[in-house]
């Protein structure tokens, strides 16, 4: 269970809990693969680092356009 940043703060950065989970998981995998962290925190845990990056607005996402039936 995360205490900081709160889920309320994180939800202001994304449109759903699913998006938040996917965004943090993808970034954590990138960190495990060797990407440089974008925040200066004491933790070495990739999920914690990714969560903090999202909270600071350093990691964003873009929804693809929906394709409907014509």
Curated annotation (Swiss-Prot):
Transferase as UniProt keyword: yes
Keyword check for Cytoplasm: no
Catalytic activity: RNA(n) + a ribonucleoside 5'-triphosphate = RNA(n+1) + diphosphate
Class of the enzyme per the UniProt entry, highest EC level: transferase
SUPFAM superfamilies: RPB6/omega subunit-like
InterPro entries per the UniProt record, alphabetical: DNA-dir_RNA_pol_omega, Pol_omega/Rpo6/RPB6, RPB6/omega-like_sf
Gene Ontology CC terms, in alphabetical order: DNA-directed RNA polymerase complex
SMART domains referenced in this protein's UniProt entry, alphabetically: RNA_pol_Rpb6 (SM01409)
Record EC number: 2.7.7.6
Gene3D superfamilies: 3.90.940.10
Coiled-coil regions, chain positions: none
Alphabetic keyword roster: DNA-directed RNA polymerase, Nucleotidyltransferase, Transcription, Transferase
GO annotation, biological process: DNA-templated transcription
GO molecular function: DNA binding; DNA-directed RNA polymerase activity
A family per Pfam: RNA_pol_Rpb6
Matching PANTHER family: DNA-DIRECTED RNA POLYMERASE SUBUNIT OMEGA
Function recorded in the entry: Promotes RNA polymerase assembly. Latches the N- and C-terminal regions of the beta' subunit thereby facilitating its interaction with the beta and alpha subunits.
NCBIfam families linked to this entry: rpoZ
Protein family membership: Belongs to the RNA polymerase subunit omega family.
Subunit field text: The RNAP catalytic core consists of 2 alpha, 1 beta, 1 beta' and 1 omega subunit. When a sigma factor is associated with the core the holoenzyme is formed, which can initiate transcription.
HAMAP family reported for this sequence: RNApol_bact_RpoZ
Protein known as: DNA-directed RNA polymerase subunit omega
Source organism per UniProt: Thermoanaerobacter pseudethanolicus (strain ATCC 33223 / 39E)
Biological classification of the source: Bacteria, Bacillati, Bacillota, Clostridia, Thermoanaerobacterales
